[in-house]
Structures are given as structure tokens and as C-alpha cells.
């Protein structure tokens, strides 16, 4: 899975930028939609993760934004 993450990192960054549209926090649903447009066969499990949130959590430059119930709802750049 680590190989695939490194190989496709540019897509994860591009999907974040496209979905962000200038916003700091980006809903995971928008990122997922952008990834599906770029990579129609995108499957989060290929990267060893059960959810898109877990995948972005593994990427060093991003952090998850949690809801009050402790559910990951969005992603933002660290720092």
C-alpha cells in the first residue's frame, strides 16, 4: 500500500486543491468526488485503509477535522 500512496500522492494533493476552492477545511465527500473524476477506478482499500479519512490521515501534510461526535468530516493542511 505504501508504494501506491507514494505513486498517487499528486492525485491526493490535486483532489484536495480542487475540492478546497480556496477554503481551509475540505469535506471528505468533495475530495472523494474529485478523486473519482481523476481516477475512476479509485478504491481506498488499495491503499490499506478502510476510509478516505484514514488515508488522508496517513499523508503527512494533512490532518482530519473531527465532528463533536468524533467522526472525521473534513481535511485540512497541517500547520
Cite the ranges covered by each PLM segment.
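N-terminal regulatory modules in eukaryotic regulatory proteins
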Residues: 1-79
Amino acid at each position: 500500500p505504501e508504494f501506491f500512496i507514494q505513486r498517487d500522492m499528486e492525485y491526493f494533493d490535486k483532489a484536495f486543491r480542487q475540492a478546497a476552492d480556496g477554503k481551509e477545511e475540505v469535506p471528505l465527500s468533495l475530495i472523494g468526488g474529485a478523486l473519482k473524476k481523476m481516477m475512476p477506478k479509485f478504491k481506498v482499500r488499495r491503499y490499506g485503509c478502510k476510509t478516505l479519512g484514514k488515508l488522508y490521515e496517513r499523508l503527512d501534510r494533512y490532518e482530519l477535522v473531527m465532528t463533536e461526535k468524533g467522526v472525521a468530516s473534513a481535511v485540512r493542511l497541517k500547520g
